[in-house]
């Protein structure tokens, strides 16, 4: 892995913002004939989604369409004006590693549905954006091939299986491939019987894993507190896209109470309908250390391949930097809960 320095990271981001490639769109299922918007003309992630929609069949696009943003709309900023923001610093520390920005490519399965190269392109795009990619155990490419494409850190996400030894073996393969952290998903819909995900089983996996161990799918302060008691090092506040439970709170709504329950004793991450840099800033203010980006990464992948992934992540990095400057927060440590006001429904 190439060592991350601030100069290298800023240089990479600057190259991204200055780039203006004119891409000739490959016509895929569902794409009408005509001009595909060049990446340099894109203004926000919703425009990337529009290109992806043109390139995918209706059935495939429906799996990554939309997102519930109502919770974000109920939050507003309380900026500080008399602050020097000439030098913005997005870097953050997570599990002993310095990240250029607190924005990661989240785990998503079977990415060849969206682009012929699938996770290989996502790995290259994430590396070009100087960020971590979290690889799903349900990837369409072997973890070893994905790792060969990655120039920045990989994490690994795994689902419970009936055979706990099979889960342990998957984790060992990921560690051997160079993954820096492992994330066990709990509470997601499963097509088959799954292992008994009580604390005893989780503890068996955690104690046999030499890299940081996270739980993804925690949505209550009580379970977050229990996770800390049981030695979990990181928690991803997530409703798995709210695909299986009507009436479930948005992850961003649960974040403040979960942050209070954890009390800084585990690293909090979050996903769930993040589409703008301001969304990321709100999550950081409410207690998250980093944000996982899911569907928009797949929009970029479907629209432009690896370059589209880089565009999506780089766009969010740039928007976060701009929002930090406008809010009077020159670095990540300066972001706290006083920045955000949550309005009653």
Where are these regions (language model features)?
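Hydrophobic faces of well-ordered beta-strands that scaffold small-molecule active sites
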Residues: 103-106, 133-135, 154-158, 182, ...
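A gly/proline- and charged-residue-enriched helix-loop-helix capping module
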Residues: 128-149, 153-166
């Amino acid at each position: 892995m190439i060592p991350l320095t601030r100069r290298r990271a800023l240089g990479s981001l600057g190259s991204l913002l200055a780039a203006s490639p004119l891409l000739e769109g490959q016509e895929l299922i569902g794409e009408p004939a005509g001009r595909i918007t060049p990446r340099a003309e894109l203004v926000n992630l919703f425009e990337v989604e529009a290109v992806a929609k043109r390139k995918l069949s209706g059935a495939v696009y429906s799996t990554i369409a939309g997102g519930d943003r109502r919770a974000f709309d109920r939050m507003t900023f309380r900026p500080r004006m008399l602050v020097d923001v000439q030098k913005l610093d997005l870097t953050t520390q997570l599990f002993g590693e310095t990240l250029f920005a607190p924005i990661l490519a989240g785990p998503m399965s079977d990415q060849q549905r969206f682009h012929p190269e699938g996770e290989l392109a996502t790995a290259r795009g994430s590396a070009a954006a100087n960020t971590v990619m979290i690889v799903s155990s349900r990837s369409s490419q072997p973890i070893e091939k994905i790792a060969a494409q990655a120039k920045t850190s990989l994490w690994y996400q795994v689902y419970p299986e009936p055979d706990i030894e099979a889960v342990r073996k998957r984790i060992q393969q990921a560690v051997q491939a160079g993954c820096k952290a492992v994330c066990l998903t709990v509470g997601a819909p499963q097509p088959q019987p799954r292992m008994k995900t009580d604390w005893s089983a989780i503890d068996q996996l955690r104690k046999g894993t030499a890299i940081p161990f996270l739980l993804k799918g925690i949505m209550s302060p009580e379970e977050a507190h229990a996770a800390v008691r049981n030695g979990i090092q990181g928690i991803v506040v997530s409703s798995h896209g709210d695909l299986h439970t009507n009436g479930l709170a948005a992850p961003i709504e649960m974040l403040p109470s979960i942050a209070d329950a954890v009390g800084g004793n585990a690293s909090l991450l979050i996903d769930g309908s993040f589409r703008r840099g301001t969304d990321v800033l709100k999550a950081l203010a409410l207690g998250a250390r980093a944000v996982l980006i899911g569907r928009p990464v797949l929009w970029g992948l479907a629209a432009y391949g690896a370059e589209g992934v880089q565009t999506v992540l780089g766009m969010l990095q740039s928007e976060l930097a701009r929002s930090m400057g406008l809010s009077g927060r020159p670095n990540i440590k300066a972001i706290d809960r006083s920045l955000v006001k949550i309005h009653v429904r």
